[in-house]
């Protein structure tokens, strides 16, 4: 298993800190971790490493206002457009992974606030992301 750090630029120019855990062999599936309020993607390292050992490529990112995306904000999300921005960010990342791993099953693992962001994304998607 190898792990790497990266950044993902959103449509409005925000840079999101992200991590990926890749299996040593070709992956059989992909998992996107969408963390909860006050968390960050690094909290899922042990779980992601375990999944990578099961031949699953795992990606996680730090939401706006969280983790290494915004280390000084401690979970603050903009009141006017924050939740919509989180949903747009998930859409961009999910679609990017679908293109990159075309044909592989892609699962979203969402916790707490991340589950609300994920549900909203699934409800508002123009096409079926599932």
PLM regions: where:
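Short beta-strand element of the alpha/beta-hydrolase
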Residues: 28-36
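N-terminal cap/lid segment of alpha/beta-hydrolase-fold proteins
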Residues: 1-25
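Primarily recognizes the serine-hydrolase "nucleophile elbow" in alpha/beta-hydrolase
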Residues: 98, 102-130
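A structural signal for the main folded, soluble domain(s) of proteins
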Residues: 18-24, 31, 47, 71, ...
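Alpha/beta-hydrolase active-site loop
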Residues: 79-98
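Active-site glycine-rich loops that stabilize anionic/oxyanionic intermediates
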Residues: 36-39, 113
